[in-house]
Amino acid sequence: MPHSVSAFQAAYIGIEVLIALVSVPGNVLVIWAVKVNQALRDATFCFIASLAVADVAVGALVIPLAILINIGPQTYFHTCLMVACPVLILTQSSILALLAIAVDRYLRVKIPLRYKTVVTPRRAAVAIAGCWILSLVVGLTPMFGWNNLSKIEMAWAANGSVGEPVIKCEFEKVISMEYMVYFNFFVWVLPPLLLMVLIYLEVFYLIRKQLSKKVSASSGDPQKYYGKELKIAKSLALILFLFALSWLPLHILNCITLFCPTCHKPTILTYIAIFLTHGNSAMNPIVYAFRIQKFRVTFLKIWNDHFRCQPEPPIDEDLPEEKVDD
């Protein structure tokens, strides 16, 4: 280690480790539930499992690499670049998985009768593979030349050094801010966010429309319908809020770095923004799994079978097709 870890860095590392310790078990539990319960094998839960795989990797790989970059070891330029790229790949995979889930929820509401014929297991698998392939393309783009090597080489040569530059490995030293803002943010983060807003607004509209039809054709208590509508709306608003809260701050800071290089960015703001992006992986099991009845039942069985040594009866795979708890 080139230098001792400061108290501030130690606190950062401690928080990152805590996030990883929450993220990895939570998302492993989601994957485990899909594996053991046949009722969780349809397209919706496959998308959620794909998201969980990405989030496990965030906790098990991205966070340790982020800690390594924060310490700033002396490495060759391309070695540092290889350390930085998995962060881009896996965070992008999480974003695309969230978008796939949003599209899947829209199709469930828009074409409920034809949903199973349109969203087949084969098509769902193709969509999942497509998300990962796109994530690899986006995340590995810096390896193919869109990076800061030319700037580093100029400074390296000016000092009379030869060979591949050896640098203190830091994310912003190797990753181009033009790439992060113009390509990553403006193409692969902001548009999916806006698209999800539109999708969930349409989902809300369609649900409200259907509930209105039911209310107008029913002599029952309309409060029941409005209550369910409100709960669904709150769930969708929570999804959007957590996504925006987690990803926008760091990208806004990147925009400030690019467009106002002389502007001062408090270090604590950068750390908070990083915590939010990584913390989103720990939030996802709660948002996408713990509000689904089939997952809760499976989680309870896993807990009792493997941790309390009190086997539960077999899971009833004919649970109602309820997606969000009433």
UniProtKB/Swiss-Prot annotation:
It is found in: Cell membrane. It is a multi-pass membrane protein. InterPro entries: Adeno_A1_rcpt, Adenosn_rcpt, GPCR_Rhodpsn, GPCR_Rhodpsn_7TM. A lipid is attached at C309 (S-palmitoyl cysteine). Disulfide bonds join C80-C169. Belongs to the G-protein coupled receptor 1 family. This is Adenosine receptor A1. PROSITE patterns: G_PROTEIN_RECEP_F1_1 (PS00237), G_PROTEIN_RECEP_F1_2 (PS50262). The chain crosses the membrane at residues 11-33, 47-69, 81-102, 124-146, 177-201, 236-259, 268-292. Residues 1-10, 70-80, 147-176, 260-267 are extracellular. Signal peptide: none annotated. Glycans are attached at N159. One of its GO terms (molecular function) is G protein-coupled adenosine receptor activity. GO terms for cellular component: cilium; dendritic spine; plasma membrane. One of its GO terms (biological process) is negative regulation of inflammatory response. Residues 34-46, 103-123, 202-235, 293-326 are cytoplasmic. Receptor for adenosine. The activity of this receptor is mediated by G proteins which inhibit adenylyl cyclase. Keywords: Cell membrane, Disulfide bond, G-protein coupled receptor, Glycoprotein, Lipoprotein, Membrane, Palmitate, Receptor, Transducer, Transmembrane, Transmembrane helix. Pfam families: 7tm_1.
